[in-house]
Amino acid sequence: MRTRILTLLLLLFAFIANAQSTYVRLVTNRGNITLLLYDETPKHRHMFVQTIKKGLYNNAQFNRVIKSFVSQGGELDETILDREKQHPEIPIQRLAAEIKPNLFHKKGALGAGRNDNPEKSSYLTQMYLVVGKPQTDEQLDALEKKKGIKFSSSQRNTYKTTGGTPHLDNDYTVFGEVVEGMEVADAINSVKTDKNDLPLEPVTFKPVILSKKQAAKFKAIKH
């Protein structure tokens, strides 16, 4: 009887955890990318959902694309900082970092952009998708020594095979990942850019929050 009750409770907890998962589709002019927003970073998840609902990402562009590194979208640093400079009466808005050791910059990771600040707090309207490249043990060893961090064996394997940008770990908040459409993210990361990393042809995107029915196909995916 106890075993049966325990099994039912575990199933209930699993159902609740899945029900809380949030998925967002980036509808781009190069194809669609589906993202899972992590439950472990609730403030960033909520922030991204709210900015989408407010339309702050409507007509957004990937405006900083660096091949084999990241594709950054939303507002540029210069736009945000200039607005803050021109309107000192408006309090500067940042989101406290939610940096977790198990949420790392593997290929497909969704991160929050930021300026150089000691709190590592995030912008509200800037995100990036990691493409990166495979790393060697020597490179990872050097990063561990330089940054005072430790990569798990699983993280090492991911960085050595799939790739990513491990030098960003422990400095920027990772709050989601690509679960569908990585080939689109790769294509965007390969577009031609000018000297400022701006795509020569605009790459636009609009985030759309998926309904429970639309998200159901992704429920079995674990990061």
Language-model features, listed with the residues they occupy:
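Hydrophobic h-region of N-terminal signal peptides that target proteins for export
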Residues: 10-19
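Residues at the start of alpha-helices and the adjacent loop-to-helix junctions
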Residues: 6-11, 168
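Cyclophilin-like peptidyl-prolyl cis-trans isomerases
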Residues: 18-223
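Positively charged n-region of N-terminal signal peptides that target proteins for export
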Residues: 1-5
